[in-house]
């Protein structure tokens, strides 16, 4: 773990400090217990002094109870500190992600961010809890036990000066070997999660095409690859335990030989040898504890690197200190705009786009798949930044606005409509959380959603399940349009957002737009000519370039692409009733 992540401890610093302090007190009691046992054996039992045995026994019990108390309290403090640390980490990452542009999110992928906020943070949480308890306990136990061994038998104490560095070096070597493998494992967890996410989201498609076996095989291959990577890492870590066990038995055997000779020579008592063996076991037990924590830390180190990646990611878009906070109107200008998702030097999705949309106009955009229709409109609310040129809204470069102010005045209904778990009221109020019930119903009427909502048994209090799977595609689109309208934006963008709506309802929505929001700039991307033929201007896109601008009548005369689309749909009866 590093400085970036430690900042998230914040209000849990007190518990994080108290836990190791209580552990030290627990260790102190545990180290004194064998000394009392030696006195009971060498003095009380050797002399048959029952009073002495009882007196020392009471002290022994008190020490054990204190050790128990300190241990329990240390555990409680460590649990609170680690759980709080994990809570803060999740909050910090989630807060950070809210500032990410689409490009930042694309860099990590959705499944990658989810893994970091769940599995990776849990790994860091567990390692942190172990660290503030066991990493405080082990060094003090080793040092104090070694000092007590030194006081009882110098020869045996020297044995540990050889053993401890050897074991420490072995642990460091194992850790360095295993760490890269754990990083690979967690990177593959992203792929695994992505596979699960895709399958669950597309479960209807999977079943419709009877592709369950294919999906199972695909998941099995990814899962097996993760298994192989994890096994490779664990095989390296697995050397920890045998090395420790071999060391423990060897040390105990050597101690018994040295201690036995000392007892025969009269330089050591039986109780003292017993105490030395207990101290030796405490030292070796602490070293084994360190190996266990070491494994946790190795896993957590890989996770913390991935979390730090997110925390150190610089949001591509940031507000300027003197950012403009008011959008004057819905006037839009594209001035020699080039755009690439890969940035400077990448393949251009949009090439030398020059365009002026007057405030209040209705603009239609049409073009084939991959013609960059969505790319064009995503530059208006600054979901992405232009690679070259500039986009202006209300006469001001979009990069000069605060993101919140700009996006508050640009309502965009994306191709992929998203509804959240909650009631219809709650979903629509995403556009304006202070809106009254009447305002919600008004925008639903404009979006032609009020009719079907009223037919639900619970009306606007109907619960939308996750992903909006209990409403049809057309209903989902209309609810999303209503949500966008509730913002009362200066610019409304519909990115193929009426594709699942019948042409009659589509016409009613456009009629409502003309009559109820005439001053709002309306940009409609559509595959159907009927959805845009009454627009003030229609933009024809092909290969990221504007191939024509004009009314439907003008384009029929001057633009071959538009004429072909129009004739294939209208004359062929493809979409007119």
Predicted features along the sequence, with ranges:
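Short intracellular "coupling" helices and adjacent cytoplasmic loop segments at the cytosolic face
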Residues: 47-48, 83, 91-115, 119-121, ...
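An intracellular "coupling" helix at the cytosolic face of ABC transporter transmembrane type-1 domains
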Residues: 10-13, 77, 99-103, 119-132, ...
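ABC-type nucleotide-binding domain
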Residues: 326-577
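Membrane-integrated ABC transporters
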Residues: 1-30, 37, 45-59, 74-78, ...
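Conserved catalytic Walker-motif region of ABC-type ATPase nucleotide-binding domains
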Residues: 97, 219, 307, 334-336, ...
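Transmembrane helices of ABC transporter permease
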Residues: 11, 15-28, 39, 60-63, ...
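Juxtamembrane helix-loop junctions of ABC transporter transmembrane domains
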Residues: 21-22, 29-42, 54, 63-110, ...
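Helix-loop-helix
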Residues: 48-55, 144, 148-162, 232-306, ...
